[in-house]
């Protein structure tokens, strides 16, 4: 407890440094990815696809907290990078909003809303509201992408007013996978 003020000041300094680095790269395309599950897989798939054309930096494994993202930005983000993929995790309401404030993504992907971390969120509605903080934090000229899960993600998609896309296996998805096989 005695070290808390010092540790908090150091953390703030690191976060502010990361924020300045990101703001100093106005051409950097920033993409936030959140969801109760599927974040890491979607991030790595997207990084693989985008790497065909762009220099991509993606947060490794599950570096999805303010200090994890801060560390990656401070230690790995270089001027050559064109795209930054930030996985955004949460255990409490407001956690995603904090990450959005750090990264300022232009694009957001919501992979799922499920019962993960109910011990801290309390209800699925709170989980959904917290995940939706990513979409709420996108700029007016940004775009949101949602899993076409036939459930909560689609309800969040319906209330979104910025450019949006529903993706999945269902026929109502604008981006749809067909004839999917596991090999």
Predicted segments with their positions:
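Short acidic/polar capping segments at secondary-structure boundaries
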Residues: 36-38, 62, 90-91, 151, ...
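ATP-dependent carboxylate-amine ligase catalytic core
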Residues: 1-27, 48-129, 133
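Short beta-strand segments
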Residues: 32-34, 87, 112, 147
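Generic detector of intrinsically disordered, low-complexity, polar/charged segments
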Residues: 29-32, 65, 86, 139, ...
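Acidic, Mg2+-coordinating active-site environments of NTP-dependent enzymes
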Residues: 110-183
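Glycine-rich phosphate-binding P-loop
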Residues: 30-50
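Short, well-ordered turn and helix-capping elements at secondary-structure junctions
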Residues: 37, 60, 73, 171, ...
């Amino acid at each position: 407890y005695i070290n808390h003020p010092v540790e908090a000041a150091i953390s703030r300094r690191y976060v502010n440094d990361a924020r300045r680095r990101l703001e100093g790269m106005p051409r950097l395309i920033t993409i936030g990815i959140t969801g109760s599950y599927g974040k890491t897989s979607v991030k790595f798939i997207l990084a693989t696809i985008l790497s065909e054309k762009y220099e991509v930096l993606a947060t490794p494994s599950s570096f999805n907290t303010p200090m994890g993202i801060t560390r990656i930005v401070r230690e790995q983000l270089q001027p050559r990078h064109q795209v930054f993929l930030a996985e955004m995790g949460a255990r409490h309401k407001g956690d995603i909003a904090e990450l959005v404030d750090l990264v300022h993504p232009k694009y957001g992907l919501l992979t799922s809303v499920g019962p993960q971390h109910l011990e801290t969120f309390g209800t699925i509605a709170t989980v959904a509201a917290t995940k939706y903080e990513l979409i709420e934090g996108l700029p007016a000229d940004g775009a949101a992408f949602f899993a076409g899960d036939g459930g909560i993600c689609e309800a969040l998609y319906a209330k979104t007013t910025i450019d949006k896309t529903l993706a999945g296996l269902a026929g109502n998805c604008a981006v749809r996978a067909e004839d999917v096989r596991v090999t």
